[in-house]
Amino acid sequence: MRKYFPEADTQLSEAVLRLAVALDLPALQIRIGSLLEEAVSRPYEVALYPVPNWKLKSGYLVDQALLLSIVRQESIFNERARSRRGARGLMQLMPRTATFIDGEQRYHRNGNADLLYEPQLNVELGQRYL
């Protein structure tokens, strides 16, 4: 899809955007929204500021808009984002920090750091850290 998208017309792009919203794919929404905004010179807020349907175990302890703005800034909603220093996931948590927040799970040992790529877990730990 990424291969063909740059050549897509506006109607097709808007259809793909609606599909990305329906399938809860916020990173794709932002990418399409940015390209559409450039193509037609008008903002696509629904795409540029997505509201994913994440079910957090403890609910939202921090304002949802604040959390989503941090996720947008840190990872652009890329669940597999990883910094050069080793921060992982949507909120760019370091494995040792996640271990400190959780208190039980050891994210910095035995390959457990990859658990931080799971969106709900990453956002849950991130909001607890805030």
Q: Where would I find each of the regions flagged by the language model?
A:
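Catalytic glycan-binding domains that act on GlcNAc-containing polysaccharides
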Residues: M1-L130
